[in-house]
Amino acid sequence: MIKVAIMGFGTIGSGVAEVLDINKKSIAARVGDEVELKYVLDLRDFEGDPIQEKIVHDYKVIAEDPEVAIVVETMGGVEPAYTFVKTMLEAGKHVTTSNKALVAAKGAELIALAKEKNVNFMFEASVGGGIPIIRPLNSCLTADEIEEITGIVNGTTNYMMTEMTEKGADFNEVLKDAQAKGYAEKDPTADVEGYDACRKIAILTSLVCGQQVDFEDIHTEGITKITPTDIKYAQAMGRAIKLLATSKKGPKGYTAIVAPFLLPASHPLYAVNGVFNAILVHGNVLGDAMFYGSGAGKLPTASAVVADVVEMAKNLDKNIPIEWSSKKLELVDYKEWENRFFIRTTADKAAVERVFGTVTYVQAEGVTGELGFVTEKISEADCEKKEAELGNILQKIRVA
C-alpha cells in the first residue's frame, strides 16, 4: 500500500482526497497497488468530518513518517509551501503541487533537488487546471522544437471577457458577477491584471527552453482597461478580445507577453469561452496541437494532481527527468515583437495617416467622436513612438 499526504485542505486539497476515494479502484489497477491517504496537513480542525482523524498541524509529522511516499501540496503561495515541499523532498518523498506561484519561483531548484534525492517533483495542475500540458511538453512533444505557445490560461478573465462580449456589460459589472459565482477572488488582482497568466507562461516557457524564465521579465497587461466600446469595435471586425499568454521563439531567442489580443473567427482560440482554458502549441514538425478543457475548479484541478500521484506511484524508485535548469534565460525585449495594432483616438484622419501611414479604419455601431483603426505590422517600439507622436490615444489592443 502506498501512503499519501495532502498539505492544504482547501478547495483543491479536498478535491484530491475526493478523487483518491471515488477512483481508488481504478487508481489501484493502474498503479498495481492501493493508494491511501494517511495525513492531511491544515491549520484547522474539521470536527464531525471523517477527515478529522487524518488531520495533523505540524508538517514534520509527514516528513518524518517513513510510510508516506507521496506528498500533495495544495496550499498556494510561495511560503510556507516552499519550505514544506523542500523538506519533503529532502526526506526522500515524491511531491506534486498545483501551486503555480511556487513552481514559477522555485521550480528549477525543486526539480534539481528531486533529481538529487531520486524522487519526483511534479506540477501538472499548476498550469491549465485539468488540461494536460506539462506532461505532453516533457514527453509526447519532445521530438519537436516548440516554436510557439499561446494560451487562454485564466478562467476568471476568460469568463469575464465572454460576459462582456455577450451581454455588453462593463468590467465592474462582470467582475461582481464573477465574484458572486465564485469564479473571481475577493481580491481579483492576480487574475484581472494578468499576473496569474504570466506565471503560467513563465512555467511553460521554462519547460520548453529548459532554462529558468523569470515571470518578472514578462511584459504583462490585464483586462481592466477593456471597455464595452472596445467590444463593439471587436464585433464590427468579426473578432473577439481574449487575454492571451504567448511565448515565441525567434531568431534572437524567446519572447513572452501577456496581453489582450483581437482574435479572428478563424483562430483556434476564438471560440474558447466562459471558464474554459485552451493552450495552442506549435512545433516545427508537429505543426499545431491544441489542449482544451476546464482550466480551474475543484475536481478538474484535483484530477491533474492525482494524475501526478499515479505517475509517481508507478515510479517510486526512479526520477523522471524534467529539463529545467536554474540557468536564467534572458528574454528578447517584447518591444522588438511585430504586430498589427487596433487603436482608438480622438485625433483626425489627417493626423492618423501622417503618423501611421496606411491604416484600415473600423466603424462600430453607436460610437462617435473618435476614430478606430488597425495599423500595418510594426514593432511594439515603433507603435509606442507613433502613439506618443499622435497623442489623444484612447485604447491600443494587439491584433492576432
Question: Which residues does each predicted region cover?
Answer:
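Low-complexity, glycine/alanine/valine/leucine- and proline-rich hydrophobic stretches
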Residues: P260-N284, K298, G357-T368, T375-K377
